[in-house]
Amino acid sequence: MQETTAQTIERVGLIPVLRARSAAQALAVVKAMIAGGVTVVEVTMTVPGALDVLRALKKQYGVKLLLGSGTVTTADQAAATIDAGAEFVVSPSFHPEVITKTRALGKLSIPGALTPTEVITAWNAGANYVKIFPCSAVGGASYLKSLLAPFPHLKLIPTGGVTLQTAEGFLRAGARALGVGSDLVNLDAIDAGNPDAIVDTSRAYLKMLEKFREGRVDTIKT
């Protein structure tokens, strides 16, 4: 049985947030991340030619790469990115029309929110997950844990300032997955001709996630 988009996101646990200064740079970053084991990528609409980047990635990698779109703020953008290959749509803020359009087209909706009121409003509007952004600017893992205390049913994805050093704390606080930007999407490494830096960081994130899950399973068993 084929995994759903939600199942893949939670199994993988990592959503690299792709920002780049050119389409070529974006494609080079994704190539390096895939070499490091990454299988999920969010292509933000701030990438020049973002729709073409989505189409190119879909054509090159097919089902091997779960594609999402990011920084989507209108229903038309959501529809366009889905047509280009996005299976999930991420916003930096709450736009009910984006949620409605995304869900109507059968895809996963991940709006952004920060305060408890914003988060529950987005969830009640039909969000599949809520992106907590910018999470690290307001307390990081402790803030995420505080949000989940009154709303344990919510599925939250912290984004903004997530690093290898802070990632495990977010997972322990209850994150369903991690949205990771510049700590993984290292544009300087690509410009310097050093894609291996991204390969290594990708592997480090996936290894950390694997170890975290093994530890959690061990705890449950005992």
Which stretches of residues belong to each language-model region?
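Conserved N-terminal beta1-alpha1 strand-loop-helix module at the mouth
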Residues: M1-A84, A104, H153, L164-Q165, ...
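Glycine-rich beta-to-alpha transition loops that act as phosphate-gripper elements at the mouths
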Residues: R19-S22, V47, L67-A75, S91-H95, ...
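Conserved functional loop/turn residues at catalytic and ligand-binding sites
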Residues: G37, Y61, G85, S93, ...
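Short catalytic-loop micro-motif centered on adjacent basic/acidic residues
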Residues: V40-V43, V89, K131-I132, I157
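Histidine/lysine/aspartate-rich catalytic loop segments that bind and position anionic ligands
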Residues: F88, P92-V138
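Glycine-rich phosphate-binding active-site loops on the catalytic face of alpha/beta enzymes
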Residues: F88-V98, K131-G140, G174-P195
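Shared catalytic-loop signature of beta/alpha-barrel
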Residues: T121, S142-I157
